[in-house]
């Protein structure tokens, strides 16, 4: 390995590391914003569920996350006890 190859080779490695870090930062910022439609979706789901079961708005949580190549929409509903 020559003197120039040593320095040129390290630049490629550091460039790849910087590129990977930038991808992580951009992905994190993209996820932090969240989809704009989630509040409206939560309201509509509450209206549909309320037709059949009385449930409070605070008991419905809608979230979206990325898992690999997929985006997963998660819906958690806490139903009231039926005594």
Curated annotation (Swiss-Prot):
Full protein name: Cell division topological specificity factor
Organism: Acidithiobacillus ferrooxidans (strain ATCC 23270 / DSM 14882 / CIP 104768 / NCIMB 8455)
HAMAP family, sorted: MinE (MF_00262)
Keywords for this protein: Cell cycle, Cell division
Family affiliation: Belongs to the MinE family.
Keyword Membrane among UniProt keywords: no
A UniProt-annotated Pfam family: MinE
Job description of the protein: Prevents the cell division inhibition by proteins MinC and MinD at internal division sites while permitting inhibition at polar sites. This ensures cell division at the proper site by restricting the formation of a division septum at the midpoint of the long axis of the cell.
GO biological process, one term: cell division
NCBIfam families associated with the record: minE (TIGR01215), PRK00296.1 (NF001422), PRK13989.1 (NF010595)
Top-level lineage group: Bacteria
Gene transcribed to yield this protein: minE
